[in-house]
């Protein structure tokens, strides 16, 4: 049961969902109009059936027409000719394309022809060859294991010879004696100027037990300063 309508009710109002009022007990319509009973859904097929005679005498093939196709520009050829002319920048190539025009040849039916497959002899056969059978005598005699051991021994001998040759060609490590021979004495830095009253002032702190211990420590420091980093030889050791 529909609610009463006021005003003129037109057929066009049934196509607008905002104006459609649902019937009591039914779902609301979406405003879709269906064609009449004489309308047939689907596409009409044209049957060109001439029987067996047409099927035997005619063979419909697709003909490729290239007359309506415009030839495309060959940018590869344009770039190649531009580079040959000495143009390398994008602006120069753009100007070259604007003043020159090279077109690609339109595709024809001959361009799609593929080479015929090679003719095969009727005696040719296609198969996968099987692995040759393993002789049972070699399995019983354990020859495969012996062969594997021999291959491993040959590989180890080659590896040892390579390592021995590499060790002989390696760099000889420097020792402390070689470093002392190559070292150069550090230049003595000039002493800073001091006031006359401070020239004969001794050290305020002496951490050695006696002058002999101090002398030994200074000699050891001077002998090891060659292999240490830094200007004064007080850094880490340079011998890796």
UniProtKB/Swiss-Prot annotation:
- On the tree of life, the source organism's domain of life is Eukaryota
> Could you confirm whether the keyword Cytoplasm appears in this record?
yes
What do the Gene Ontology cellular component annotations say?
cytoplasm; cytoskeleton; dendrite; external side of plasma membrane; membrane raft; motile cilium
Cellular location of this protein? Answer: Cytoplasm, Cytoskeleton, Cilium axoneme; Cytoplasm, Cytoskeleton, Flagellum axoneme
Sorted alphabetically, which Pfam families does this protein's record hold?
Answer: CFAP77 (PF14825)
Q: Name one GO biological process term.
A: positive regulation of focal adhesion assembly
Nucleotide-binding listed as a keyword: no
Major localisation: cytoplasm
Sorted alphabetically, which keywords does the UniProt record give?
Cell projection, Cilium, Cytoplasm, Cytoskeleton, Flagellum
Q: In Gene Ontology terms, what is one molecular function of this protein?
A: GTPase activator activity
Which InterPro entries does the annotation name? Answer: CFAP77 (IPR029147)
Known function: Microtubule inner protein (MIP) part of the dynein-decorated doublet microtubules (DMTs) in cilia axoneme, which is required for motile cilia beating.
Q: Which family does it belong to?
A: Belongs to the CFAP77 family.
Q: Which PANTHER family match?
A: CILIA- AND FLAGELLA-ASSOCIATED PROTEIN 77
**What is this protein's name?**
Cilia- and flagella-associated protein 77
């Amino acid at each position: 049961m529909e609610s009463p309508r006021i005003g003129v009710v037109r057929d066009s109002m049934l196509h607008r969902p905002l104006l459609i009022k649902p019937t009591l007990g039914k779902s609301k319509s979406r405003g879709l109009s269906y064609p009449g009973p004489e309308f047939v859904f689907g596409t009409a097929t044209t049957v060109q059936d001439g029987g067996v005679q047409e099927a035997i005498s005619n063979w419909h093939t697709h003909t490729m027409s290239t007359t309506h196709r415009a030839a495309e520009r060959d940018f590869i050829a344009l770039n190649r000719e531009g580079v040959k002319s000495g143009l390398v920048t994008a602006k120069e190539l753009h100007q070259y394309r604007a003043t020159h025009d090279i077109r690609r040849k339109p595709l024809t039916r001959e361009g799609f022809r593929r080479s015929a497959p090679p003719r095969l002899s009727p005696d040719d056969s296609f198969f996968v060859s099987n692995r040759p059978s393993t002789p049972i005598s070699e399995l019983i005699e354990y020859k495969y294991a012996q062969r594997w051991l021999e291959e491993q021994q040959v590989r180890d001998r080659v590896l040892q010879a390579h390592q021995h040759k590499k060790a002989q060609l390696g760099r000889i490590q420097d020792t402390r004696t070689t470093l002392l021979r190559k070292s150069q004495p550090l230049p003595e830095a000039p002493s800073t100027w001091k006031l006359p009253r401070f020239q004969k002032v001794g050290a305020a702190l002496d951490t050695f037990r006696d002058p002999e211990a101090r002398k030994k420590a200074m000699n050891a420091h001077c002998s090891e300063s060659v292999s240490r980093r830094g200007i004064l030889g007080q850094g880490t050791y340079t011998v890796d």
